[in-house]
C-alpha cells in the first residue's frame, strides 16, 4: 500500500471540514458528516474534538479500503466519505463508477469522472461541483 503523507491527509481533513460543515441537528449525520451506523450512539451535540477524531478514523478506514488505488487512495477515499464507498467502487447490483473503471485499467486521466460526482437528485449542484474541483486540485498527485 502507498503511504499517504501526513500533510496530504491533513489537507483532505481540512477540505472535508470546509465543505461538509458542522452537522449539529441533521441526524443521521453528526460532527463533520459522519453517518450514524446501527448501534452507534454518537450525539449531534458532540464536541469538535470528538468529531475531529471520528472524521480522522473514518477517513483512515476509507484509505485502507481504497489502498489498492495507490497514489489515488486518498482522493477516492475523500470522495467515498461524501458519496458513499459503494457508490464509487460498486458492490452487488451497484456498478463500478467510470472513475474506478479507469483507475483499474491504469488510466489516471480521471478529472471529468471525479468532478461528475456533483449531482443531487439528478441535478448538478454548483457547490458540490466546486467541492469536487477543490478536492481534485488538492489531492490528485501526478
Q: Could you tell me what each predicted segment is?
A:
Residues 74-87:
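Short N-proximal segments of mature Sec-exported proteins
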Residues 1-26, 34-41, 46-65, 85-142:
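Long, amphipathic alpha-helical surface segments
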Residues 66-73:
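Structural motif
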Amino acid at each position: 500500500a502507498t503511504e499517504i503523507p501526513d500533510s496530504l491527509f491533513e489537507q483532505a481533513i481540512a477540505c472535508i471540514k470546509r465543505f461538509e460543515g458542522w452537522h449539529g441537528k441533521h441526524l443521521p449525520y453528526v460532527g463533520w458528516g459522519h453517518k450514524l451506523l446501527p448501534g452507534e450512539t454518537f450525539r449531534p451535540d458532540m464536541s469538535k474534538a470528538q468529531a475531529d477524531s471520528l472524521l480522522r478514523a473514518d477517513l483512515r478506514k476509507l484509505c485502507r479500503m481504497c489502498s489498492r488505488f495507490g497514489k489515488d487512495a486518498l482522493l477516492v477515499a475523500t470522495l467515498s466519505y461524501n458519496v458513499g464507498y459503494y457508490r464509487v467502487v460498486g458492490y452487488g447490483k451497484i456498478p463500478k463508477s467510470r472513475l474506478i473503471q479507469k483507475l483499474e485499467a491504469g488510466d489516471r486521466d480521471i478529472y471529468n469522472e471525479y468532478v461528475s460526482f456533483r449531482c443531487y437528485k439528478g441535478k448538478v449542484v454548483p457547490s458540490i461541483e466546486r467541492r469536487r474541483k477543490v478536492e481534485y486540485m488538492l489531492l490528485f498527485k501526478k
